[in-house]
């Protein structure tokens, strides 16, 4: 079951020749989303061949480097005769602004577009086996982050134990693994608890958008399999980070450490580090898990916690 992210834009507020403004494409099996949609996001989707089958766009805040790609995307989908509905999730109070941005240049489109406000702590998208939750972040304007959280999975089936109990190889194995008891020919009933292990955790993907280190971010990122965190500045620019509502790489690493995240992606890299993000990378060296500076076009697959 695939869960992967493709970084479409990893720059700070000002793009560079190597980095587009913020956007992350997320694919989970047949579902596809965008986290933020900076300028030229649609071109990045074409460039990195993600496909355009996006059902939801999750906007963290209203700054241009996170939303200026929306009008082009929405109207290109219309030019391509899209009929599937689109939901754009935005922080509270931003619905009218985003509606004006999306439709002021090109007018209405021929498919349903729903703009809904995301309240921190709320589930903003539900699916059979995962959900997307909004959480509070700390930026210079109204902002939220988003966590994609999978449900626990069924425990492992102990075939050897099932055979010891006399369960014949065949359909009864599947019945037990699906959580239903089976009756053997001699009348013995075997329950799932006898042959199926404890539930196994699903995966958690967390995207902060722009933020200072913040306790609600730590809570949302608890045991996350991948935390994508603002790392606009190197550690020697901590005052500038605080002034602008951003984080240093070291602060991102501290959040990841406190949360117990397994992997950390550093993004929203300031243009002052154009061509050389080594200071950003070095700044996160205090994190014991996997840490990397995201770059445009990078695809990262998120494994299950028990994949080994």
From Swiss-Prot:
Chain sites annotated for binding Zn(2+) 1: 61, 63, 139, 210
Enzyme class: hydrolase
Gene designation: rnz
Cofactor binding note from Swiss-Prot or TrEMBL: Binds 2 Zn(2+) ions.
InterPro entries, per database record: Metallo-B-lactamas (IPR001279), RibonucZ/Hydroxyglut_hydro (IPR036866), RNase_Z/BN (IPR013471)
Protein name as it appears in the record: Ribonuclease Z
One GO MF term: 3'-tRNA processing endoribonuclease activity
Organism lineage string: Archaea, Methanobacteriati, Methanobacteriota, Stenosarchaea group, Halobacteria
The protein's required cofactors: Zn(2+)
Database matches in PANTHER family: ZINC PHOSPHODIESTERASE ELAC PROTEIN 1
Keywords from the named record: Endonuclease, Hydrolase, Metal-binding, Nuclease, tRNA processing, Zinc
Main function: Zinc phosphodiesterase, which displays some tRNA 3'-processing endonuclease activity. Probably involved in tRNA maturation, by removing a 3'-trailer from precursor tRNA.
Highest rank taxon of the organism: Archaea
Catalytic activity field: Endonucleolytic cleavage of RNA, removing extra 3' nucleotides from tRNA precursor, generating 3' termini of tRNAs. A 3'-hydroxy group is left at the tRNA terminus and a 5'-phosphoryl group is left at the trailer molecule
Active-site residue list: 65 (proton acceptor)
Family annotation (CDD domains): RNaseZ_ZiPD-like_MBL-fold
Transmembrane segments: none
Amino-acid positions noted as binding Zn(2+) 2 in the UniProt annotation, renumbered to this chain: 65-66, 210, 268
């Amino acid at each position: 079951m695939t869960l992967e992210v493709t970084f479409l834009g990893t720059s700070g507020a000002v793009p560079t020749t190597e980095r587009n403004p913020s956007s992350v494409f997320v694919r989970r099996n047949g579902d596809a989303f965008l986290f933020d949609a900076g300028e030229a996001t649609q071109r990045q989707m074409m460039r990195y061949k993600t496909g355009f089958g996006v059902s939801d766009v999750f906007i963290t805040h209203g700054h241009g480097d996170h939303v200026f790609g929306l009008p082009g995307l929405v109207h290109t989908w219309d030019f391509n005769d899209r009929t599937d509905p689109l939901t754009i999730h935005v922080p509270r109070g931003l619905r009218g602004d985003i509606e004006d941005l999306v439709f002021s240049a090109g007018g209405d489109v021929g498919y349903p577009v729903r703009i809904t406000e995301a309240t921190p702590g709320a589930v903003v998208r539900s699916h059979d086996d995962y959900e997307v939750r909004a959480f509070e972040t700390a930026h210079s304007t109204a902002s939220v982050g988003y966590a994609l959280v999978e449900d626990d999975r069924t425990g492992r089936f102990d075939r050897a134990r099932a055979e010891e109990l006399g369960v014949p190889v065949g359909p009864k194995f599947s019945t037990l693994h699906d959580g239903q008891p089976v009756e053997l020919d001699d009348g013995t009933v075997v329950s799932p608890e006898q042959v199926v292990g404890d539930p196994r955790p699903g995966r958690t993907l967390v995207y902060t958008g722009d933020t200072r280190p913040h306790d609600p971010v730590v809570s949302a990122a608890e045991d996350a399999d991948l935390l994508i965190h603002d790392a606009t500045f190197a550690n020697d620019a901590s005052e500038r980070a605080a002034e602008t509502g951003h984080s240093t790489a070291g602060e991102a690493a501290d959040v990841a450490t406190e949360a117990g995240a397994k992997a950390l992606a550093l993004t929203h890299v300031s243009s002052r580090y154009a061509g050389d993000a080594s200071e950003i990378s070095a700044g996160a060296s205090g994190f014991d898990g996997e840490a990397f500076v995201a770059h445009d076009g990078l695809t990262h697959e998120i494994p299950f916690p028990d994949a080994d």
